[in-house]
A protein has these predicted regions:
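Residue-level signature of transmembrane alpha-helical entry/exit and packing/kink sites
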Residues: 5-10, 82-90, 143, 147
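Juxtamembrane boundary at the C-terminal end of a transmembrane helix
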Residues: 156-169
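Juxtamembrane non-transmembrane "cap" segments at the membrane-aqueous interface
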Residues: 104-126
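Hydrophobic alpha-helical membrane-embedded segments
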Residues: 8-30, 93-112
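Membrane-interface helix-loop junction between the first two transmembrane segments
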Residues: 23-45
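Interfacial helix-start motif at the membrane-water boundary
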Residues: 44-64
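Short, membrane-exposed interhelical loops at transmembrane-helix boundaries
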Residues: 118-140
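Hydrophobic alpha-helical transmembrane segments
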Residues: 58, 133-152
Length: 169
């Protein structure tokens, strides 16, 4: 494992993922409200268009696919070998995306969205916009769900792509 490369790849994909998701959250704000804390989600629900939610999920899945492909291809070309090393490379890189999500989307984007009154219709006066309330949902997600469930899945996908590429090339 090449730690400096893991850090740089993790940071690069963290920026790509989080700024990509952040950008589209301003294009389809009502759809993105479905991923916010419960109070905001419920307040915004009458204004959410199902077609926009489908677009949002297509965008997010496309961004995830690009991230996983980059991780797998980059790991393959870095010369990392062995399933354990490939897995941990993908895991650590996705951990960077996770913490970037916490800082960029859950802290920075929340503050920007909160200050743009009317961006998410119906949720303008929700208590869940306050940092403490928001973090009640964000911290368990980023300190438990991502490291225990999602990062290992990312590690498996990264290892799978790199192993597949090693058999092809």
């Amino acid at each position: 494992m090449i730690i400096s490369r893991i850090i740089l790849d993790g940071l690069a994909m963290s920026l790509f993922f989080n700024f990509g998701v952040g950008l589209f959250s301003f294009i389809l704000p009502q759809a993105y409200s479905t991923m916010f804390p419960k109070e905001i989600k419920e307040a915004a629900a009458p204004y959410v268009v199902k077609k926009d939610v489908k677009k949002m999920y297509a965008i997010i899945l496309s961004i995830y696919a690009a991230v996983f492909l980059f991780f797998g291809i980059s790991t393959y070309f870095s010369g990392v070998t062995g399933f354990r090393n490939l897995f941990w490379t993908g895991y650590i890189e996705m951990l960077f995306v996770n913490f970037g999500d916490l800082l960029i989307l859950d802290c920075l984007l929340r503050a920007v969205t909160k200050n743009k009154k009317g961006l998410i219709k119906g949720a303008e006066n929700c208590k869940a916009w306050n940092l403490g309330e928001w973090m009640k949902a964000a911290l368990p997600e980023h300190l438990l769900f991502w490291p225990i469930i999602f990062c290992p899945i990312a590690g498996l996908i990264t290892a799978g792509i790199a192993i597949l590429l090693s058999h092809i090339g």
